[in-house]
């Protein structure tokens, strides 16, 4: 796995393997690197530093607003599902009461038939 290095380390490595160590022939390697100094980078499994893309406050604000809207939609959907589940639970409890009453009625009818 390749590791990122700081710009300072990258420049030091290039200085260390500068022009006096470069043989002038461009050797291409399988990973797309060219030249001797890139061999050093590959040898130590280092990656050149990547340029960081900075965002403006406005872009960040837009991203934040979009994320908040998405989260609000998800929250509203979950609240609606919770209400549905609560209503179904109440219906189930009513059905259980009805079934228990019917069970008692059947029991009493069975006792009447036996006697």
From Swiss-Prot:
Pfam annotation, one family: DUF16
InterPro entries, A to Z: DUF16
Family note: Belongs to the UPF0134 family.
The protein's name: UPF0134 protein MPN_283
Taxonomic lineage of the native organism: Bacteria, Bacillati, Mycoplasmatota, Mycoplasmoidales, Mycoplasmoidaceae
